[in-house]
Amino acid sequence: MDRIIGYMISPLLCKKISRGLSAGRVQSVAVKLVVERERKIKSFVSEEYYKLYAYLKNSKNLPLTLQVTHKKEKIFKPKNKNKIKLAIDILKKIDFFVINSFEKITFSKPSAPFTTATLQQAANVRLNYNIKKTMLLAQQLYEAGYITYMRTDSTHLSQDAINMAREYILKVFGKSYLSKKERKYTNKNNLQEAHEAIRPSYINIISEKKIKNLKLDAQNLYNLIFNQFIACQMMSAKYNFINITVKADNFKLHTSGRTLLFDGWIKIMPLLGQHYNDKILPILKIGEKLKLIKLIPNQCFTKPPVRYCEASLVKELEKKGIGRPSTYVSIITTIKNRGYVHTIDNRFYAKKIGEIVTDRLEESFNELISYDFTAKMENNLDLIAINQQYWKNVLNIFFKKFLQKLEIAKKDPKDGGMQLNKSVITDIDCSICKKKMMICTTSTGVFLGCSSYTMNIKEKCKNTINLIPKLEILNIIKNFNLKKDILLPQQYCHNCNTIMDCYIIYGQHNIFYICGKNPLCNGYKIKKSNLNHIITTKCKKCSYNMYLKQGCFGNYMLCINDTCKNTIKILSKSDIATL
């Protein structure tokens, strides 16, 4: 089914939008996730707000810090300085009393042993491996006999595996670290349970010496799998949790914290970042009066949604029931290769062609890239695999609707067919033939191309001008500590009031704004800029200026000194490489 969908829609996309494009039942949904997140980030407007912290002490002079969370039973989140100053003036004059104070013991259980998806996520977050690298290394470990099969949805462990893990814990860590009962993890419905969870094959046979003979990347992945396997049979981590609520007239203040009492499984699988959240707080009596030391306001700004990384994209696909362990690598590889998305610092950014393809599929094949439909179809395919559904019935129901929509999409846009990816004519003259340049969007990016190339004439002009996306420029000028909001302010289309995409015209360094609805809307703006003088650096060989250039391998800096011609590659992490 997936192959037929791809074979039928992909030629249509190539004809209507651009060459080299493809669509698929799962890959198109993955692109849609990235595009929707991209648009939320673009449309996000940061808002100022304030947090207010009160530094108090009790009768024994033990200090504690609480946040003012409520005023008159409503969340306290003032959006300007005047309101925060008014609150400070009131709080300075009133008393603080404890209205709630309790402590309790909490436990944190270990996660299940790895499935394919959770291994990909953990390796991405903990080891910074992309999922393609993770699966390649896992394949090598499996072929060498170090781990069990690495394509599985199951968290199930055999009894032999459980015994093996528990014997290791007892021997290495002692009885206090061994969970009192065997931990057995259940699976979701319709998952591929032909294999166990991913685990070391035989930890008693595979010595540390053998592991050390592996390449470092393979060692790290094996150790991650090993540690998670052992951790799943260890004792829970034990915390002392304390919660304190204080009242001051109409205001409520709150703080909480936990202290690690026993590490348990964390001993072998340490938490990342500040997840321990150790915060020692005094035990207070209800009704106890506290003394104010000081009040500190903290200016904050709301933040846009976080971009997907490979781990979070796989997690979101898994959460929505889309795709299977064996498909995640090919999905992400395909959407990158087609030019729909690209990654910077392991974060996904939607490219313009990805937005256009998503919009056209949404218009012509809305069911195909619906999250619910894709998950339901995935479930039906699983039922077919276990003979609970007849495959012809499932496919016939789908293809009857699909073929009808395909025939409509093939029609001319005037007759309700899929919209074309039209080029938008601009007022910019071609430097070669003096005809007008037009905005073009393909799988390789957005650029200006001469309009005579599309005319029915013998000598077609192939002149093009590259457009550098705002993101790439901001990455470069970070080296000069410039304020990006002054250099590249957000603009709205004068035709439809949509947020405009920002580019720099290569060679001119003028700012070029294109309507976010392009090519359906032909709105654009050109603004002069001094970026030509900003995007420079000194050559370390001859001290001449170096200017931004574009090559087939990306952006780089080139020395203008003809006798030097030194180049410096601009790294993906936005920094200019040092010689």
Annotate the PLM regions.
Residues M1-E103, A197-H254, T259:
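Phosphate-backbone binding and catalysis cores of DNA-processing enzymes
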Residues S18-S22, E103-A112, A122-L127, M150-Q159, ...:
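Conserved short loop/turn motifs at secondary-structure junctions
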Residues S43, I84, I131-K132, D153-L579:
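Basic, low-complexity terminal or inter-domain segments flanking catalytic cores
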Residues F44-L66, N100-L137, L448, Y513:
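C-terminal accessory/connector segments of nucleic-acid motor ATPases
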Residues K93-K109, K294-C300:
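Positively charged, polyanion-binding regions of nucleic-acid-associated proteins
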Residues V98, P110-A123, T148-M150, P304-E316:
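Short acidic, hydrophobic short linear motifs in intrinsically disordered regions
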Residues A144-G145:
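Short glycine-/polar-rich loops that comprise or flank the Walker A/P-loop
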